[in-house]
Amino acid sequence: MTAEKEAEYLFDKNVECPVCDSTFRTRVVKTGRVRLLESDFDLIARHPDVDTIKYDVVSCPYCGYTALNRFFTDLTRGQKMLIREGVCSKFHPAENGDEEKKITPYSYDKAIDRYKLAFYNALVKKGRASEKAYTCLKISWLYRGQIEQLEAEQRADLAEKIQTCRQQENAYYKQAYEGFIDAIASENFPICGMDEHTVNYLVASMAYKLGHMDVASKLVSAILVSRTAGRTVKDRAYDLKEQIIEKLHE
């Protein structure tokens, strides 16, 4: 994908910060124009001309409050106080404040920085395990996208950066996995907008990638015997079951 092509799918919308009440612009994707190409085994959506994950964070440029879109307005009074004390009091607004007028795509580095600020905010406000896990998962996905972008350049001088990105991808992936395990045990469904079977499949796929075959097998089996799981998630679970069996026989 090129920056010029990606920019065609973006626009700025006005958002009101629930912490400092400032109004600012944030970059979002024109979802009606985006075509789904495919999904990775762990549900990351692929689009041909834009990495939509880069634009799923809202960050107030005036006070520093930052969160994924789905969690941005979901704050208790106590959490607002924690954010003001733990984030806003230390935040230094950029001189330009709002988004630049020209709509340009975020680099992976900028998108990752925004997500890391969202994760820090989630820690400060004592957010749910699922919010922290989902944020970590998306950071991991961004590193995956950045690795693919860097590898496509086929430059020897990028080898060290690719290795660093891969280490970060794995670290945040493990953190996301552990967070979702906690969320399944302590939260009610839906979790992050996903029903029980979708979450179970996601965690099973993550467990498979991390080598936790016992967890992956248990969750896949629960999906396959469920009377309420849909055909799509059952098909995915069956494919994952075949991969698990193949892996165990290596």
Model-assigned labels for residue ranges:
Residues M1-E85:
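N-terminal cysteine/histidine-rich coordination modules
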Residues Y115, A122, R166, Y173, ...:
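Inward-facing hydrophobic residues that define packing positions of alpha-helical scaffold repeats
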Residues A122, Y143, Y173, G179-A183, ...:
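Alpha-helical junction/boundary sensor with strong preference for TPR arrays
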Residues E131, Q168, Y172, N188-E196, ...:
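Structural signature of alpha-solenoid helical repeat junctions
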